[in-house]
Structures are given as structure tokens and as C-alpha cells.
Amino acid sequence: MKTYRKSALILLLFAIFLAACAPRLPATVAPTFTVVPATPTSTPTSEPDPVSWWQDRVFYEIFVRSFKDSDGDGIGDFQGIIQQLDYLNDGDPTTHDDLGVGALWLMPINPSPSYHGYDVTDYTAVNPDYGTMDDFKQLLAEAEKRDIKVIIDLVLNHTSTEHPWFQASQDPESPFHDWYVWSDTKPQTPGPWSQTVWHRNAANNLYYYGVFWDGMPDLNYDNPDVRAEMLDVTKFWLEEVGVDGFRVDAARYLFAEGSVQQDTESTIAWFEDWRDFYKAIDPETFSVGEVWTNLQVTAKYSEGMDSLFMFDLAEDIKNGVYAADSARIVASYQDVLTYFPDGNFSAFLSNHDQQRVMSLYGRNVEKAKLAALVYLTGPGTPFIYYGEEIGMTGNKPDENLRRPMQWTDDARGGFTTGTPWQPLEPDFEEVNLALQNENPNTLLNHYRRLIHLRNAHPALRGGEYLPLSSSCRQVYAVLRLLEEDALLIIA
């Protein structure tokens, strides 16, 4: 039985869902959250379980190409990120004009023939568009000064067709031939979502397996040389470069077993061995996996990576806010906590593959604020997609989800002095960081307050998630509770 002692209770109020069950606010009132003293409550006296560093931080996803250009070539780079580190976190916990994030996830930084970088040509080098390895190490050093951790995208499943391994593998006599999956004839088995996965190679008239498209051939993880090589790649980035961990792309597809091409027992087992491998190098290494499927299947990977993205939860938060259906949000969190009771999962609203939140909400800032409140005060490790905090918009195709960051209202949005690699969103003159800095009621400052609140309260980072009953379905009410720290969130 738990024992309890008295503690102060912090109450968060947010006037969007509440407005559905009460008279509407005047148009001049800007919805925001308020922190006020409330009646004391009881909390457990038992010591909380120790948490890992990633459970104590808010992450920020950066597409390097689109974040900040330092040299005028129109392409974001490592030096550009360095220039903006103080915006992300100035390293001083007493200040509140930075965003307050504690870790960065950099989308692929390896050399690649594509703009996005998910078809790698060299696993132990950086994309020259972004700078040199020395530039990247400088970024790591500057981030460390501010207590910012840095993880990178690790594309384990496939390479580019331009990778030297694949080029060599086209020769059936090459020792690299079995690094990929080849067939003399075209198998008729469709891919996991009924797509074509066997692609003809003009150089040898054979067919190779690639689950995503013909420019990304899958590596053959049945080959022990491939498995050993990817362990060496992992070790390189941890020991020789010094990153803090990895976001694992396309984790579901490493091994096929007959006609089953995703979530096989061999894939799940490999990740468990991989985790043991990198923890032996540095127990503080962090990995988060992209396992884009339902919660039940995602949970099978929980022993192979430190955290996993909750795609169903993201949809339930966004759509629950859209429809003013708090019950959907609460039920989704409860489902996740059934499989991850320690809260060791990753929450987000959108990423580089999904419609931006502000586009979903039709530029409704109030709904964007509420969605932010829900996931930044909820359990799990939050991941913010760059530009989300200022309400950048973006709809498919993918290039439009990854446009340059909107820093100012000048002709190039403060992103570059040259020609941006991709046009900015047309609304950048009205939606930009410089403009939102000036008004305390903007989405940007709402994000700042929420992140700093989360940083200040252990209950938000690792406390119990206790939904409270309400006679109004539109009211979102939960208690976050950890030892003497308690927060009541009502929206």
C-alpha cells in the first residue's frame, strides 16, 4: 500500500475544450494556459524510479538542409545549426527566452544523391552539402556546452543504388553480391503494402529487392558480413564521432521470412542484440525506433530500442483536438501506458513524412496550442518537428513538409542570403519566428512556456497519468503526479 504526504498542486487551465461546455470567450481574449495555486493534494512518498536522460528532455527534429544556411548556398548546414543553438537552448536554466529543448534529432547527415538523405552512399562520412566532419564535431561540442544531446538518423535497412557496395554487388562474382537480395527472375510476391519490391537491374539483368523504391535496395541481413558492418557503423558514430544515439529508420523491414516482409522474429531479435552491442559501448546511448504500425506490433520492439514512436497516439491527439473529443485522447494514452507503463515511449504530433499540424487545423492557432499542451504535458518523451513551434504549414508531397525554416519576414525568410534550395511557404512574412517573438500570446511563446514548465516539473516528465471524470466529453482533465510534484491539467 502506498503512503502519502501533502504537497502543493499546480493547476493548468486552457480555454479551448472548456469553451465547448461554457459561454464563448470574447474574441479579444487569447486562449492560453494559466498556472495558479490550488488545493493541496496527497502524493506517494516512495522514491521514483531513476530515469534516463532521454526521459527528462524534449527533443527537436531538424532537417539540416532546411534549418539554417550559414554560407549563402541556399542549403542548411551544421554551422547554421550552431548559429541557432542559443534559440533552441542557451544552456542557462534561469533564462526563458530560449525554446528549452534538451536534445536534437538530425535527419540523415550521410552523403546521398537525394535531397532527403535516406539513400546513403557512405555510412561513415557526412554530406558535404552540410559541411565537414570537423563542422559536425564542432556542432556536437557546442551542443554539449549547452547540455544538448544529439542523435542522428541511422538508415539500417537499405542503401542507395549509388553506394559502392551496391555497385560492386551487381557482379555475381563479387564478394558484395550477397550484401543485397538478388533473384534471376522477378518474384511475384508483393510488398508489405502491396507495392512492387523487385526491381530489374539493367547492368546484369537480375532483380534486386527494395521495399521502398528502386533507388533504395535493401541490405541482406541474412549475410553475417552485413550485420557485422552495421555494428561497425554504430560503433564508429559512438566512439569516433561522439553522437548520443540514433533514430532508427524503417526498423520493421530488416529480415524477411518467406513471404513475411515486416516485423519478423529475426528483425526483432536483431535489434535486441544491437541494443546490447551499443549499450556495451556506452550505457547512456539512446535509440528511438520508427516502427510505423499499430501499438500491439510496435511493443514487440521494446527490448530492441530504448524508445519507440507512438504513431497511433499522434493521430489520436491531433484528431481528438480537431473534434474536441478528449475521451479519444485519454483512451489513447491509456492504451499506450498499458504496453509502456514506465512511460518510456516517444510522443509527437507530426514529422517529416506527415502533414504539418497547422495545415491539419486550417491555421487555427488555438487548436495548435491545445495539441501542444496535450503532448507536452503528457507522458512519454516529446519530439517537436522544426517549425511546429511557430505554426509552419505543409501538405504533401514530402518536399512541402520539409521547406526552409521561417526565421524572419525578409525576402528569404532569414534562412539564407542566397536562393533557398526549396521555396519557403508563401505565408512566411506573417508566420515567422522574429514576429512571434514580439507577442507573448503567440504559438512560439506558448511552446516556450510549456517546455520550460515540463523541464521544471518531474511530474510532467515521469509522473503518473491519472484521468479525471468530467460530465462534458470536450473537457480534458488529467492529474500528473510524482512524489511531491502534482499538476492538474484542465483544458
Regions found by a protein language model. Name each.
Residues 54, 275-281, 286, 292-293, ...:
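Loop/helix patches that line or flank the sugar-binding groove of alpha-linked glycan CAZymes
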Residues 16, 21-47:
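Ser/Thr-rich, Proline-interspersed low-complexity disordered segments
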Residues 21-23, 47-228, 235, 251-296, ...:
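Acidic/aromatic-lined carbohydrate-recognition and catalytic surfaces
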Residues 167-212, 216, 319-338, 402-429:
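Core domains of carbohydrate- and sulfate-ester-processing enzymes
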Residues 117-126, 306-316, 400-403:
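Short glycine/proline- and charge-enriched loop/turn segments
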Residues 96, 101, 242-243, 305, ...:
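A structural motif
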Residues 2-10:
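Bacterial N-terminal signal peptides that target proteins for export
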Residues 44-49, 193, 232, 293-297, ...:
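Alpha-helical scaffolding within the catalytic cores
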